[in-house]
Design a protein with these regions (language model features):
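Flanking scaffold residues of small Cys/His-coordinated metal-binding clusters
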Residues: 1-2, 16-17, 27-30, 48-49
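Short cysteine-rich clusters marking metal-coordination/redox-active sites
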Residues: 4-7, 22, 33-36, 54
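Zinc-coordinating Cys/His ligand positions in small cysteine/histidine-rich zinc-finger domains
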Residues: 12, 22-30, 41-42, 51-57
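Short, conserved phosphate-binding/catalytic loop or strand-edge motifs used
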Residues: 165-171
Length: 318
């Protein structure tokens, strides 16, 4: 027998923690480092994404150029107006090397902290480039995406041709309506649009059916009207690996697009998302129900030149 050095209670030595504490006192005084498993006094614990770490492991996490998958810094919103789009671009087959990621960060963050890099377990030998949320205008005029993509190509990375990569676009929910009800109505029209024009969107995305089924599946819900489509999506039980991912609290994520390192294709994708959001916000359910793909394509304005050209290349003008 021995005594707990904290509360004085008698305990069997084999039941003691660290040879001196009862289990209750140990639980109140110590935590276990998520990374290395060492015991850490609560006064010395460092937290990252609400997980406990010892000082050494915490320093390693924060010093790394390629962050872990769960890394989520506070978002920095760039550009005036709405919506804001957060980009996740996966690149592969060039190595998950901090030196390579640093080269990309030096280009993207020359003016401001625009992007960061993360580990992604779905990739074979690469990482994910993630942007802070920004307006389409800011993405176009200020974040040097062409230089970022060119640098990735120069280092030997692939995105479209790897077969593993996606280009995901997060839309901030707050931009989709002033009230929760308005936001839900806008989201319903986006879901309905994807269901109604699935074949067209799949061609636009450059994904194969197999890739879409695995990473960005269709809900296959009712197309009677947008509200029924949203209801079907929410009760589908499909989780986050859907073309329109609704599981995030503050964003709607469009996951359907295949990764790309071609600047014009990248910008055409952002312009497509921006146009869809604009129409979903401003049109009624009835207008969405009667709209044809040709009518949608005809609304592409001159300032979305990359989208106009891309629709022509993909045979999606009608």
């Amino acid at each position: 027998m021995t005594e707990c050095s904290h509360c004085g209670r008698s305990i069997w030595r084999d039941d003691s923690r660290n040879g001196e504490y009862c289990q209750d006192c140990y639980d109140s005084l110590y935590e276990t480092c998520t990374e290395c498993g060492d015991d850490v006094c609560r006064d010395d614990v460092c937290y990252h994404n609400d997980e406990p770490y010892c000082q050494n492991c915490y320093d390693e996490i924060n010093d790394s150029i390629i962050h872990d998958y769960y890394y989520k810094p506070d978002p920095i919103f760039y550009g005036n107006g709405q919506p804001h789009y957060g980009i996740e671009l996966e690149i592969d087959e060039g190595g998950e090397y901090d030196d390579n990621a640093e080269r990309i960060l030096n280009i993207g963050n020359r003016i401001n902290e625009h992007i960061y890099c993360k580990h992604d377990g779905s990739l074979d030998d690469g990482f994910e480039i993630v942007s802070h949320p920004a307006t389409l205008e800011y993405h176009t005029k200020t974040i040097p995406w062409k230089n970022i993509l060119d640098e990735a190509l120069e280092m030997g990375y692939y995105s479209h041709n790897s077969g593993t990569c996606g280009l995901h676009v997060h839309i901030n929910r707050a931009a989709l309506g002033e009230s929760v009800e308005e936001q839900e109505n806008t989201i319903a029209r986006i879901v309905y649009f994807f269901e109604k024009f699935w074949d067209k969107i799949l061609r636009f995305s450059r994904r194969t059916e197999t890739q879409a089924d695995r990473w960005a599946s269709r809900y296959g819900c009712s197309m009677d009207n947008p509200k029924e489509s949203l209801k079907g999506a929410k009760t589908s039980g499909l989780g986050r690996y859907t073309a329109v991912n609704l599981t995030n609290t503050f964003t709607v994520e469009l996951r359907i697009f295949r990764g790309t390192l071609r600047y014009k294709t990248f910008m055409a994708t952002l312009q497509f998302v921006d146009l869809l959001c604009e129409m979903a916000i401003n049109l009624t359910d009835e207008e969405f129900q009667t709209m044809t793909w040709k009518e949608f394509a005809k609304t592409v304005s001159a300032d979305k030149a990359e989208l106009k050209e891309y629709l022509k290349i993909r045979g999606l003008e009608e």
